[in-house]
């Protein structure tokens, strides 16, 4: 699973979810990609589930690139705990994804295989997404 090797601080503030993506809006490595249409926190487990769904479908052909990284810890207090007494412990790591961000890319496979593999990965993600091609248009 994707987690940072080390961080300067154990806990961070929650990231802002509004606004459009400032960079990473175009396909950089592969031929097809998944672009976010809504803001969301994507956990390291969701990224891994999407990666497995894609790689299992394309089998040995092609290559997958993950262009987001879960670098923010999200804290949670235990169930049944009263309010107060400090911030909770880090539960999981998230990537803050803004609309327009390309999260996964795939290359080296046919368009039909790429479309189906990316559709399976989209089912694992918590927000609305679309499949885009390197030319810039929808598939």
From Swiss-Prot:
One of its GO terms (biological process) is translation. It comes from the Bacteria. The keyword tRNA-binding applies. Keywords: Ribonucleoprotein, Ribosomal protein, RNA-binding, rRNA-binding, tRNA-binding. GO terms for molecular function: rRNA binding; structural constituent of ribosome; tRNA binding. It holds the Pfam family Ribosomal_L16. Residues 1-21 are annotated as: Disordered. Part of the 50S ribosomal subunit. Binds 23S rRNA and is also seen to make contacts with the A and possibly P site tRNAs. Belongs to the universal ribosomal protein uL16 family. This is Large ribosomal subunit protein uL16. It comes from Bifidobacterium adolescentis (strain ATCC 15703 / DSM 20083 / NCTC 11814 / E194a).
